[in-house]
Amino acid sequence: MEPNDSWRVDSEFRYTLFPIFYSIIFVLGVIANSYVLWVFARVYPSKKLNEIKIFMLNLTMADLLFLVTLPLWIIYYYHEGNWILPKFLCNLAGCFFFINTYCSVSFLAVITYNRFQAVTRPIKTAQATTRKRGISLSLIIWVAMVAAASYFFVLDSTNIELSKTGAGNLTRCFEHYEKGSMPVLIIHIFLVFSFFLVFLVILFCNLVIIRTLLTQSVQMQRNAEVKRRALWMVCTVLAVFIICFVPHHIVQLPWTLAELGFQSGNFHQAINDAHQITLCLLSTNCVLDPIIYCFLTKKFRKHLSEKFYSLRGSRKCSRVTTETGTEVVVPLSQVPVNSLKK
């Protein structure tokens, strides 16, 4: 493959930003999502998973798919945008990036709609058997996203660029668009408008949930706690969308136009810089998604609280020195209360 003209702009700060940021996301994301899977396996028998827990489990799997490719991107940006790995791994990384992004959007959307039904039609929702629907919707989402992402797996994903330092050529991964390519533009227009259509539906559902919860009279303290958690859940889902997905899709279309040669100069450089930042924000959904689970399931919160207090308790074990000078560990429950006061 011959090197192409170096007409495209570059944002060189990304070669420092992405390795650091993606490393943090990788560590936090793997820990958080692996813990979620462990809790699901330990607390919830597979046959007792209801619709929303099925969606949560699938969302976790989508996040882990993206996380396993982060080391590939870390290596890529560490080498200043030079893909030194086998070409098929570039295709795989791009494929999993697409699957994670739009599976996450889809599963957050159906989770929101599930909560919308629970608030607006509580009796009907409580009586409905939703396990089969959860499995069916999950299969539809996965099949649709994998089918769409297969395009990136067969695409010629790499291209050769001349290094700006003149030290040789760089192999780029998913960083080349043919000037004026209308198919590429149409695909991006479809993705961006589809996202904002889904976002508007989610925004509407969440606003209805908030209004309904705020207008309900609270007669018991327990109900007040349930309402508080429900409101936090709504705010968390909206925060994930606004922080992670909205900035990327706002920038995506003008960035595509600039990459295709419809815009140039200072605008192209500015929008390319902004695009790199939105890619970082997009990856944070892998860390933020597990927070939603804390507000959605009672058992998950209980298990997390028990582990947290268990760790605190083990750290607070009192060390008492006997008269003989031998140090022994005494459980906290057996230490007099007055001895713990400092």
From Swiss-Prot:
Q: Chief subcellular site? A: membrane
MF terms (GO), sorted A to Z: G protein-coupled purinergic nucleotide receptor activity; platelet activating factor receptor activity
Q: Name one GO biological process term.
A: G protein-coupled receptor signaling pathway
Residues with glycosylation annotation = 4, 169
Q: How does it sit in the membrane?
A: Multi-pass membrane protein
Q: Name one GO cellular component term.
A: plasma membrane
**What S-S linkages are listed for this chain?**
90-173
Q: Which UniProt keywords apply?
A: Cell membrane, Chemotaxis, Disulfide bond, G-protein coupled receptor, Glycoprotein, Membrane, Receptor, Transducer, Transmembrane, Transmembrane helix
Ranges that cross the membrane: 17-38, 55-74, 92-113, 134-155, 185-205, 234-254, 277-296
Q: Which Pfam families match?
A: 7tm_1
The record's annotation in InterPro entries points to:
GPCR_Rhodpsn, GPCR_Rhodpsn_7TM, PAF_rcpt
| Tissue specificity note | Differentially expressed in the lung, heart, liver, skeletal muscle, kidney, spleen, small intestine, endometrium and white blood cells. Expression levels are higher in the endometrium of pregnant compared to non-pregnant individuals. Endometrial and embryonic expression levels increase from day 10 to day 16 of pregnancy.
Q: Which Gene3D superfamilies match?
A: Rhodopsin 7-helix transmembrane proteins (1.20.1070.10)
Show which residues sit on the Cytoplasmic side of the membrane. 39-54, 114-133, 206-233, 297-342
Q: Where in the cell is it found?
A: Cell membrane
PROSITE patterns, A to Z: G_PROTEIN_RECEP_F1_1, G_PROTEIN_RECEP_F1_2
- Topology feature Extracellular, residues: 1-16, 75-91, 156-184, 255-276
Xref: CDD domains? 7tmA_PAFR
Quaternary structure? Interacts with ARRB1.
Identify its protein family. Belongs to the G-protein coupled receptor 1 family.
List the PANTHER family. P2Y PURINOCEPTOR-RELATED G-PROTEIN COUPLED RECEPTOR (PTHR24233), PLATELET-ACTIVATING FACTOR RECEPTOR (PTHR24233:SF6)
The entry's function note states: Receptor for platelet activating factor, a chemotactic phospholipid mediator that possesses potent inflammatory, smooth-muscle contractile and hypotensive activity. Seems to mediate its action via a G protein that activates a phosphatidylinositol-calcium second messenger system. May have a role in peri-implantation development during pregnancy.
Annotated protein name in UniProt: Platelet-activating factor receptor
Organism equals Sus scrofa
Q: Name the gene that codes for it.
A: PTAFR
